[in-house]
Amino acid sequence: MGKFEDKKQLRCSFCGKNQEQVKRLIAGPGVYICDECIELCSEIIEDEFEGNTESSPLETSNLPKPQEIKDYLDQYVVGQDRAKKSLAVAVYNHYKRINANKAEDDVELQKSNILLLGPTGSGKTLLAQTLAKMLNVPFAIADATTLTEAGYVGEDVENILLKLIQNADYDVERAEKGIIYIDEIDKIARKSENPSITRDVSGEGVQQALLKILEGTTASVPPQGGRKHPHQEFIQINTSNILFICGGAFDGIDKIIEKRGTKSSIGFGAEVKGKSEKNVGELLKDIMPGDLLKFGLIPEFVGRLPVLVTLEALDNEALVSILTKPKNALVKQYKKLFELDNVKLDFTEEALKAIADEAINRKTGARGLRAIVEETMMDIMFDIPSEENIVKATITEETIKDRKDPELEKLPEGEVRPTLKTEKKNKARKDIETA
């Protein structure tokens, strides 16, 4: 009888209910917990976990609209309005698709990866980086020229996924919603439109290797990178929801487009067209998948990049805007550098145009702007820390074109400019005195 009473007295150590008042009582070393308390603890932990994590911008309610995405891109990338619109719509649809496919539905939305085509320095990489920054998703950049087919010297395509996992701090679930930008994708084109008899390990072979991860597969990634071997553990990652953006200059594809658009005719009534009738940017707008096949991409690869976004070569006006307008514009960066030495830096309008002209002449686009400014500023940046009477430097057109010294404003001989810290203290003291 005593044993029966003892059995009835078994109680939950948390809520005090006995075993007859609950569905289940789980025993531990000297303690008991009921099913109700387990459920309550689970809810508390779940709420706390959700409270500590940022609200994901990728949920349908938080997903930025195409117009908002373009407005954000406008803050960092100058020009390329058509490309920004196309990218904004493609990215919006991609993450909307991820949320839609979570629900059980007969219709499964397929992934649309993106191919960016445009000359060097037109903003392809910056667009992809800025998108990832806005969406707060892991982002990785890979160079297609370093990739080779499995079994050959070079990087396996799985190493691209490893970079993404590393940038997500090895949070695979987060990495599975990231963005991968593969640069120089035009360099893995095969040498001709026709299939090659010989092995093309860095061209067609890489395209074949990329097919599966572009489409969506569960890939095995070596956690330390390098080649796979059978005795190591792998990280499993599903690429179905990873957005792949491939970019390339595709030098010479304009001739393929032009050839397709010009029907050759013979005789007195034949229409003769000048080669310079359309510039490269205008021709790229007319690109078709067939042009990419002629360039050397295989049909299966082109099929997995259905969204074609073209960028135009930047003109003088656009390059000047890049120098001055974005949040992190190059001119603003150099002004800040000089400000740290308490020196004011100015660029004349003619100097900015001369920098842009030089970038166009070098055919380096926006990417070459920093190199030109750095070359111009080298001597003055060398002198300023030592010459403590310089308070202002003005970069003129002659400074850029003829490498003449900038126009300098100096204090009278014997005077030294105050350090930035001293000037701030003096200003604060003056504010207090006048208060």
Curated annotation (Swiss-Prot):
Disulfide-linked positions: none
UniProt GO MF annotations: ATP binding; ATP hydrolysis activity; ATP-dependent protein folding chaperone; protein dimerization activity; unfolded protein binding; zinc ion binding
Region (Disordered): 401-435
Subunit and partners: Component of the ClpX-ClpP complex. Forms a hexameric ring that, in the presence of ATP, binds to fourteen ClpP subunits assembled into a disk-like structure with a central cavity, resembling the structure of eukaryotic proteasomes.
Role played: ATP-dependent specificity component of the Clp protease. It directs the protease to specific substrates. Can perform chaperone functions in the absence of ClpP.
Residues in ClpX-type ZB domain copies: 1-53
GO biological process, one term: proteolysis involved in protein catabolic process
Coiled coil spans: none
Family the UniProt entry places it in: Belongs to the ClpX chaperone family.
GO cellular component, one term: HslUV protease complex
Alphabetized UniProt keyword annotations: ATP-binding, Chaperone, Metal-binding, Nucleotide-binding, Zinc
Residues that coordinate or bind ATP: 119-126
InterPro entries: AAA+_ATPase, ATP-dep_Clp_protease_ClpX, ATPase_AAA_core, Clp_ATPase_C, Clp_protease_ATP-bd_su_ClpX, ClpX_bact, P-loop_NTPase, Znf_CppX_C4
PROSITE patterns documented for this protein: CLPX_ZB (PS51902)
Signal peptide: none
Protein name: ATP-dependent Clp protease ATP-binding subunit ClpX
Presence of keyword ATP-binding: yes
Positions contributing to Zn(2+) binding: 12, 15, 34, 37
